[in-house]
Amino acid sequence: MRDSDTDIILYISLLGVCPVIGLCGIIANIINIIIFIRNGFTESINVSLFGLAISDLLALLFLVPFAAFINPYSLYSEDLNWNAMDFALILVAFPNSTFNRTTCLITVFITVERCLCFVMPLRVKSLITPRRSAIIVAAIFALMTFNLVLAYVAMQLDWRLDPGRNKTMIGTVLTRHDSSELLNIRNIISLCSQLFSLLALVVSNIALAVAVKKQAKWRARIVITAPQQNQTAASNRTADSTTYRNRRLARMIQFLSLILFVTYFFSSVIYLISQFVREFNFYGRYKNEYRSFWMVALAAQGLNSSVNIVFYYRMNIKYRNRFNKMFRKGIARIGIFPADHNTMENTIVALSHRDTVR
């Protein structure tokens, strides 16, 4: 791939697509964080989604500044005494990739948690408490932060000879005799965590789909035999409401998992190729291909971190109600305020109220 082709991809991705996606995603995730805080952390799923929003926000905060380093002036100006690619790698690329993988692992945990809600509905609340969810999410952040620290221990910015410009510039240098080993450990952790995340997402979502289907069949049998078991209509409606809410939340998690799998599959392939092709890296023989592929992967990962708000609003009743309260005037002004979502829960509540009046 020619240098000019690589530059076109870099500019489109980092000067056009990524800043727009990043800024929209930052606003969306700030809204997510505020809503989850206001809804409280009495449920473990809120704790997990709050951690996911923080991870997405941090990833996007390091995505937007790419444009400050990767632009025509910083890449080709002879007046600068620092290497733009090296600065981008150290200051934004490493943190961005760290929080992207954090997002992957937290999404896996959320999916497994939802799966357990269907497989072990009576035990899941005692098994996965809000406190335990917070500990697991914090442990994921700690593991990925350790992975980031390895990179900063092995590399730093300092004066070095830049062969491309034949001058001394500030760029990345290895700081220790074992820096190569530390970077290899970091790469292995990064690769394993991402491959594990994708594999776990596939397995857990298949299990979740099977569990949802089994619960639906079980509920259908209960409804048929309810009169024989002297179950009241009110208890049936309560069970229907709970079942519907769980299924709706499961669908939301499945959509989030699908988007994450699609957007992160590309970067996982890049990691695999780089492990088997020595020159396929940031500075090797195939650096243009490597950098171009990563720019596309960055845009895809940024999109994944930005679209969650849409699924939360469409599929989470508590989130939607809180969102509507926060932005009621603005939503009403543009005519999209959902006065009645025609959800099953609204119908059940109305029927229950009617029976109570009777």
Regions found by a protein language model. Name each.
Residues 220-239, 325-358:
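Non-transmembrane, juxtamembrane loop and terminal tail segments
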